[in-house]
């Protein structure tokens, strides 16, 4: 082998070694860069998860956020849902009840589908998506709670006081009419009783609503419980029992709201709806009234100085010094109900308490009722509905009778 050949082989070997070193260096550099990117990504994720909160940002910007809660029974069937608005700046929460047979839109071009059917086919994600499409609002927090979790949470706050409007005697549940104290298992049995008795979906939702409202009243009236709400143990105990996308900083702010709540913290309303030709409970005016209801409640929750414009088709009702409705002392705020029941069917509008309530009657049937309870201590009540709903209707305010003209 001559010297030239040996030199070429040596150069080839050197080139190969240099190429291997270069490739190794590239891999090392790529590994370092990937490690840095992964490290930065982990830091950003940890910061976002443990320190960043949309509620904190909304508080700084004086904005309101939207959330949704889905309640599910032991048979994995929804009781119903609530669309909610929260202001972390003003410590106020507004919720609108959605019964399980309310029709929601998956697509505005298609027909609406009942909430319980959406849950049956696509689970809670399908329900939350339909609520977003129906309302046109981005839901920041999505929460699901089942019967066991309802029971555990009620036990954690020491129980809830309820007003029973009719005598109950079934299985392990036996109560006379009047105020009763429920532990978690009794509360769940009470909700089961409503299903067994065949209550309408909207009425079952009202009773669930009563549990929520009375739990809030219990917190308001118990300073010790309010302070307990700030403890890490109670936060972890309650939040571990719900399925949600709430993160630690969100939970901290939410429990601060509960720890500083008062009788004006929670505002509860019900969606206005009517049965369509398919037998589905459908938001009135193809959902536009629901969106307006949300916008008005958002302004109220955010304590904005300007109210939404009242158009010609809107009608307003102001009741001064309205307190104390017999049998409804567990209500914390005014409610605007769609019921469609005949007068006296549930006994909420008997002659004894008619003088303390405002009702709208159409064609001899009670269409809506405006009521507050003794606990709320509200001097001024403001309610609004759409004038187009009031064809052929009259308003009875106390013992006074008003015709509603177009």
Where are these regions (language model features)?
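Entry/capping segment at the start of metal-dependent catalytic domains
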Residues: 2, 8-100
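Extracytoplasmic
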Residues: 62-64, 77-81, 90-95, 110, ...
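C-terminal solvent-exposed extensions
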Residues: 71, 100-102, 111, 239-313, ...
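Extracytoplasmic/secreted envelope proteins and their assembly/folding machinery
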Residues: 80, 124-132, 147-151, 155, ...
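Second-shell loop/turn segments in exported
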Residues: 113-121, 135-141, 195-203, 223-224, ...
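Amphipathic, coiled-coil-like alpha-helical scaffolding segments used for oligomerization/assembly
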Residues: 121-178, 243-260, 265-268
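Flexible, polar/acidic helix-loop-strand segments at domain edges
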Residues: 155-242
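BRCT (BRCA1 C-terminal) domain core and associated BRCT-interaction motifs
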Residues: 342-404
């Amino acid at each position: 082998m001559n010297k030239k050949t040996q030199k070429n082989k040596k150069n080839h070997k050197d080139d190969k070694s240099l190429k291997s070193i270069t490739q190794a260096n590239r891999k090392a550099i790529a590994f370092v860069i990937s490690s840095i990117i992964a490290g930065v990504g982990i830091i950003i994720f940890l910061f976002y998860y443990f320190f960043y909160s949309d509620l904190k940002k909304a508080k700084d910007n004086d904005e309101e956020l939207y959330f949704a809660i889905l309640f599910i029974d032991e048979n994995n069937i929804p009781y119903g849902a609530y669309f909610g608005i929260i202001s972390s700046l003003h410590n106020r929460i507004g919720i609108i009840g959605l019964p399980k047979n309310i029709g929601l839109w998956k697509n505005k071009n298609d027909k609406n589908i009942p909430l319980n059917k959406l849950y049956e086919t696509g689970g809670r994600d399908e329900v939350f998506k339909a609520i977003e499409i129906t309302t046109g609002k981005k839901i920041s927090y999505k929460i699901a709670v089942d019967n066991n979790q309802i029971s555990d949470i009620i036990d954690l706050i020491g129980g809830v006081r309820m007003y029973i409007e009719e005598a109950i005697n079934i299985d392990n549940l036996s109560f006379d009419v009047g105020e009763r104290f429920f532990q978690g298992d009794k509360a769940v049995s009470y909700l089961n009783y409503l299903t067994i008795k065949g209550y309408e979906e909207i009425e079952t939702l009202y009773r669930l609503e009563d549990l929520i409202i009375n739990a809030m009243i219990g917190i308001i009236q118990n300073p010790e419980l309010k302070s307990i709400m700030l403890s890490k143990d109670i936060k972890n105990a309650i939040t571990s029992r719900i399925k949600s996308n709430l993160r630690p900083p969100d939970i901290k702010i939410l429990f601060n709201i509960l720890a500083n709540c008062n009788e004006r913290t929670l505002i509860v309303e019900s969606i206005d709806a009517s049965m369509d030709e398919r037998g589905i409970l459908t938001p009135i005016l193809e959902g536009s009234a629901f969106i307006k209801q949300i916008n008005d409640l958002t302004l109220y929750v955010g304590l904005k100085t300007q109210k939404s414009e009242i158009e010609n088709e809107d009608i307003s009702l102001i009741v001064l010094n309205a307190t104390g409705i017999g049998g409804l002392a567990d209500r914390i705020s005014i409610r605007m109900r769609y019921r469609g029941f005949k007068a006296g069917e549930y006994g909420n509008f008997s002659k004894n308490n008619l003088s303390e309530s405002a009702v709208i009657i159409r064609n001899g049937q009670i269409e809506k009722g405006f009521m507050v309870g003794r606990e709320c201590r509200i001097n001024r009540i403001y309610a609004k509905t759409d004038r187009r709903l009031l064809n052929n209707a009259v308003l009875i305010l106390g013992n006074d009778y008003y015709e509603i003209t177009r």
